[in-house]
Amino acid sequence: FDPHQEVAGWPMVIDIEETFYFKPDGRQLLASPCDEAPMAPCDVRHEELDVAIAIDRIQSATTMEIRHVTSAWAGLRTFAPDRRPVVGWDSTAPGFFWLAGQGGFGIMTSPAMAATATAAITGGSVPEGINPERLGPNRF
């Protein structure tokens, strides 16, 4: 949506209960109601009710008045059972490498996940602060 002010330097904002987030996306703000609806893989489409819920939550928590939604979309989020990403070689399927389960954090975690995957594939150094065993598929 168009916030009618300069937002390029704004941080990503998530409310404490994780019921919405918004972040700069060019001159606009990208927003989400942080909803999760279990479903089979499909060509998912946004629901107008979810757009209205996001608007209501953001307007209730901020001083912003959302007058116009520029575009709306929906996406499927994949989670592992423990809700952590899965990165590593599968011991039950030789040659198969997992890089999945980022849930709603794929864009934000992609640099760290890519570096972790690169290290696992090439035998390089894992980024500081990442324990590959906590992310590996063999933890299940």
In which residue ranges do the predicted regions lie?
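Active-site lid/adjacent beta-loop-alpha segment flanking the redox-cofactor pocket in flavoenzymes
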Residues: 2-95
